[in-house]
């Protein structure tokens, strides 16, 4: 299956790509020129790239933050400087789709499509999590329609594979209503979250979700596990091998590609 690495830190991406000869690199190409990426791909033609796209959240560090900050819904609890965003806004949708086009032009064949859990947040409500609202949240159904539009446009018109990261509540609906569109999924923290072993119930929940999705896709189930314990890694890898899943172990909360 070749190498599998994830790197979302700008200064680490190019060194990681240069080390890889084949396999899949999942990167955030923001701030990296298409020429740089294409030069690497020319030297390593067996290397495949998926690029990061964040349709449901806005990060303060991004160059477009000021332009879209009026669409912030609430702070993202686990990441400083990140906010859930109103994906139903047409200007934002157009921007995200154009970003997908730019990423394809750089050499990506697919997207790591993050934070579709916004659908769940709008469905279940932000208030119960003690979140201070910055604007009224859109309805879950309107979020669903917006995400469906973005995904279908990116796959059918832009021509990129969409690999959602997480978002099981959204995907259980989308994959039934639009079968054969999603062909690969990514899931973080099935066994470990923030370098702590998950409860049995949480692990079983995510295992069940990944197995459900696997029956409906032709591509791979990919996991990111935040775990440094070698014995636990061995057990997880054996489980993934039995189920024909791919797994990447990260030593850091930020994905650095090591």
Task: List each model region and its residues.
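Glycan-processing catalytic domains of CAZymes
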Residues: 1-258
């Amino acid at each position: 299956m070749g190498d599998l690495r994830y790197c979302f830190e700008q200064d680490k991406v190019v060194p990681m790509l240069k080390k890889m000869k084949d396999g899949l690199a999942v990167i955030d190409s923001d701030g990296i020129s298409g020429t740089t990426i294409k030069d690497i791909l020319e030297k390593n033609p067996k290397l495949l790239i998926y690029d990061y796209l964040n349709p449901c959240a806005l990060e303060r560090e991004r160059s477009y933050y000021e332009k879209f900050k009026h669409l912030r819904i609430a702070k993202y609890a686990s990441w400083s400087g990140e906010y859930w965003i109103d994906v139903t806004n047409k200007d934002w949708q157009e921007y995200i789709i154009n970003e997908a086009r730019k990423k394809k032009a750089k050499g990506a064949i697919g997207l790591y499509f993050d934070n579709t859990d916004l659908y769940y947040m709008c469905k279940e409500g932000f208030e119960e999590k003690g979140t201070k609202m910055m604007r009224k949240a859109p309805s879950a159904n309107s979020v669903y329609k917006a995400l469906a539009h973005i995904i279908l446009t990116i796959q059918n018109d832009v021509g990129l594979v969409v690999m959602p990261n997480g978002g099981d509540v959204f995907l259980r609906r989308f994959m039934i209503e639009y079968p054969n569109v999603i062909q690969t999924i990514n899931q973080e923290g099935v066994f470990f979250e923030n370098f702590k072993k998950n409860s049995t119930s949480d692990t079983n929940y995510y295992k069940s979700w990944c197995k459900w999705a696997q029956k409906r896709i032709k591509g791979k189930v990919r996991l990111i596990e935040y775990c440094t314990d070698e014995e636990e890694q061995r057990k997880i890898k054996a489980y993934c091998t039995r189920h024909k899943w791919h797994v990447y172990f990260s030593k850091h909360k930020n994905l650095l590609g090591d």
